[in-house]
Amino acid sequence: VIEAFQSAGDVLRLRDVVIRTGYSKGMCFRLLYTLHQCGFLDKVGENHYRLASEVRRRRLYRIGYAAQGQDSSFDREVGLSLARAAEREHIELIVVDNRYQPKIALRSADYLVREQVDLVIEFQTDELIAPAIASKYLEANIPFIAIDIPHPGATYFGANNYQAGLMAGHYMGRWAKKHWNGEVEEILLIELLRAGSLPKARMRGLAAGISEVIRLPAACRTVSIDGDGQFQTSLERVRKYLRESKSKRILVGAANDPSALGALRAFEEAGRAPECVIVGQNAEPEARAELRVANTRLIASVAYFPEKYGDGLLRLALDILARKAAPPAVFTTHQVITPENVDHFYPNDSLLAAPG
């Protein structure tokens, strides 16, 4: 019955407790009366109850969070938003850092199993080890949520990858139609191959979105390279690509913003920035700063709003722990962020760079 109060501020009626617990009305009435008499519940009004203050201060659940890493602002935003939501819900959050490394991710899973957490939120990039990680939680009978990369047996939370790619492709196609009369010579896709099928769907969506807006010339070719989601790797591989490509009108779609910014740097170093336009994914602070630069060749980035992940993840986690019916996948919302609307969606970015 106490677990029916899913957050510290929940005020429930008798029938709410009946619905959440599945117990009979008579049993719930007796239990509510007893819990109130014993000091576990406060009565609010005539027929409403909430957790007593000393119970509210207790951590209702212990949830493990295996963070992807701390190198990108996206990862940090997800972690911070989750920590804020956990604190508000009086949940103990056990945090480990996978540091983008498969071996560490496996050790992190072992640690969370030993900690006997109630649920795990898993954020790791490598699709190849997802089955091994999943088996650890499944054997321990620990429910888990997988962020952005599917894991067998997990509830998925994160990007609608094909849709995010499609939105980017539509925007890029409209830009090419307006500024280049649709005369595109090459499409460069900077992928994140080790993350598997879903980020690849992002790239498929982007290519499809471009084709839905403009009729690509027969001579236009599509080139794919693996940027591994990293600025430096993308910079080096786009440098190599530019040594081989002589195209003058290139649409560049990147799996994430570090890859997009690495590509932009490579084009700028080669003195070929006017020959490209670039669209990123995630709308991270570094990309938003670039969107504010006059005449930048980064024309857009699709936002995933990681600062809102924590609330959505905790709602989903509490539903799972309360044994409510949970969907197999929960998708985040997306928005194309451009130089024209970046200040509307992120009016407080200047505070990020403020001293102190």
Show which residues each predicted segment covers.
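Hinge/cleft segment of the Venus flytrap/periplasmic-binding protein
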Residues: 61, 198, 210, 305-356
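Periplasmic-binding protein-like
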Residues: 64-66, 116-124, 143-147, 186-189, ...
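N-terminal helix-turn-helix/winged-helix DNA-binding helices
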Residues: 52-70, 114
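Hinge/beta->alpha junction and helix N-cap segments in small-molecule ligand-binding domains
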Residues: 66-80, 95-105, 126, 158-168, ...
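Hydrophobic alpha-helical
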Residues: 112, 119-138, 206, 224-290
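N-terminal helix-turn-helix
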Residues: 1-56
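Short, hydrophobic alpha-helical segments
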Residues: 113, 172-177, 242, 313-325
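Flexible loop/hinge segments that line or gate small-molecule binding clefts
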Residues: 127-163, 186, 284-293, 346
